C-alpha cells in the first residue's frame, strides 16, 4: 500500500528521532526471510534494546541526511531492515550476527558506529565489542588488581617480620 506524503513525512520524522538517539546503525538485506523469522528477529532485537525498522530506502535516506549516518545512504539498495543501537554500540551488530548464523537469508550490507561506513566484513569485530557493563567490570578489575597485589605484598612482609621476631 502506497503512503501519502503526510504518512511519508511522519515516517521520516519517526526514523529521524530514532537516528538522533542511536549510537550505531546496521542495514541488512532480509530477502528470503519468512514473517516468523522477521518476528523472531524483532523479538531478539527488543530483548537487546535495539530498534528494528523496515522502511523504504528513500525515506531512510531522507532521515539520515545531515546525520552521522549520512554516508551509509549510498549502500541502501534492495529490501533492507535497519537496526539502531543506543548506548550499547555493539548490540545491533550482535543481534544481526547471531541471527544470521541460523538464517543465512539475512545479509548485512553496511554498518556504522558514529561517522564512517563499515562493510559486512567488520560485523564480527563490532559484535565482539564488550557491553557497557562488561567494559566497566574489566576496567574495575584492571584498577583493583595492582592495589590487591600491593596489599598482599604488605601482608607477606608483615608475616615475614613476625616470623623473624618469633
Curated annotation (Swiss-Prot):
CDD domains: Ribosomal_L10
One GO term (biological process): translation
One Pfam short name: Ribosomal_L10
Gene3D superfamilies listed in its UniProt record: 3.30.70.1730, 6.10.250.2350
An annotated GO cellular component: large ribosomal subunit
InterPro entries, per database record: Ribosomal_uL10 (IPR001790), Ribosomal_uL10-like_sf (IPR043141), Ribosomal_uL10_bac (IPR022973), Ribosomal_uL10_bac_type (IPR047865), Ribosomal_uL10_CS_bac (IPR002363)
An example molecular function term from Gene Ontology annotations: structural constituent of ribosome
Keyword terms: Ribonucleoprotein, Ribosomal protein, RNA-binding, rRNA-binding
Role noted for this protein: Forms part of the ribosomal stalk, playing a central role in the interaction of the ribosome with GTP-bound translation factors.
Subunit structure: Part of the ribosomal stalk of the 50S ribosomal subunit. The N-terminus interacts with L11 and the large rRNA to form the base of the stalk. The C-terminus forms an elongated spine to which L12 dimers bind in a sequential fashion forming a multimeric L10(L12)X complex.
Family per record: Belongs to the universal ribosomal protein uL10 family.
Full protein name: Large ribosomal subunit protein uL10
Gene that specifies this protein: rplJ
Amino acid at each position: 500500500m502506497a503512503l501519502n506524503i503526510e504518512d511519508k513525512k511522519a515516517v521520516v520524522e519517526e526514523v529521524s528521532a530514532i537516528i538522533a538517539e542511536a549510537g550505531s546503525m546496521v542495514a541488512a538485506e532480509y530477502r528470503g526471510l519468512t514473517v516468523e523469522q522477521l518476528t523472531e528477529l524483532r523479538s531478539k532485537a527488543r530483548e537487546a534494546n535495539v530498534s528494528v525498522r523496515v522502511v523504504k530506502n528513500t525515506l531512510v535516506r531522507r532521515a539520515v541526511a545531515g546525520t552521522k549516518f549520512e554516508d551509509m545512504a549510498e549502500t541502501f539498495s534492495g529490501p533492507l531492515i535497519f537496526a539502531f543501537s543506543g548506548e550499547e554500540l555493539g548490540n545491533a551488530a550482535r543481534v544481526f550476527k547471531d541471527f544470521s548464523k541460523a538464517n543465512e537469508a539475512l545479509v548485512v550490507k553496511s554498518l556504522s558506529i558514529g561517522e564512517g561506513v563499515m562493510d559486512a566484513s567488520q560485523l564480527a569485530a563490532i559484535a565482539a565489542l564488550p557491553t557497557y557493563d562488561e567494559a566497566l567490570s574489566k576496567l574495575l578489575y584492571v584498577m583493583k588488581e595492582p592495589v590487591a597485589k600491593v596489599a598482599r605484598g604488605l601482608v607477606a612482609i608483615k608475616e615475614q617480620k613476625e616470623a623473624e621476631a618469633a
